[in-house]
């Protein structure tokens, strides 16, 4: 990564409780914020904004969305008042053309997939942000190609942060007691790590075809938490380092794996 080029990050966000807790994952997020070059703006792709078509937040002051239930009141009392950037939102509309991108001026904001990690990285909430939705109607290869389009922003001081979990099966999660990963979750997590720097035709990429892995569908019964990774892999230039700043599996079937490009 050149001194002026921003990294691209995929962060495994896990439980909303990470907002309130001090643990190995939140400390790693804080360390990233303290050691990476400070961006002039951030584009976030979160698993929690899964839409038909593509949208981007385009308001001056996006709201903090508490898109979860059954947690302590302190979590609902927490807000992340980072400024929006209508100018950056319009830049994304132009950059991603001919893909139609809707400017969202009131409906969405920053959901816990975005603010839940960035509140640890940049607790002062003073970096302009926009959030880009994930089009639920498109195949995996399309999302990797979107990452390629977004890569040019990295040379303009803009950081790409994608947030999800490469293993995300809440039906099998061990909510209490034993925290041992399921063998299939560990195997799929290892498969992801082994293929981060694969190069070849997009349609043949092992992580575009992640459901072909024997643990793919069990690790991801729905695609929205896996797809954000593909945006970051698409932003890789094929030569810069790809590292794993954070790894681990919580509750048996929730991967906290994070990936840094650049």
Regions found by a protein language model. Give the residues of each.
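Short, basic/glycine-rich phosphate-binding loops at helix/coil junctions
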Residues: 9-10, 67-72, 122-130, 207-208
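Internal, conserved structured core segments that host functional sites
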Residues: 89-144, 149
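Beta-strand elements within well-structured catalytic alpha/beta cores of enzymes
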Residues: 7-11, 41-46, 132, 153-166, ...
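Solvent-exposed alpha-helices and their adjacent loops that cap or buttress functional pockets
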Residues: 2-3, 35-36, 121-125, 152
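Short glycine-enriched loops at secondary-structure junctions
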Residues: 47-51, 62, 109-118, 166
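A short aromatic-anchored loop/beta-hairpin motif
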Residues: 2-103
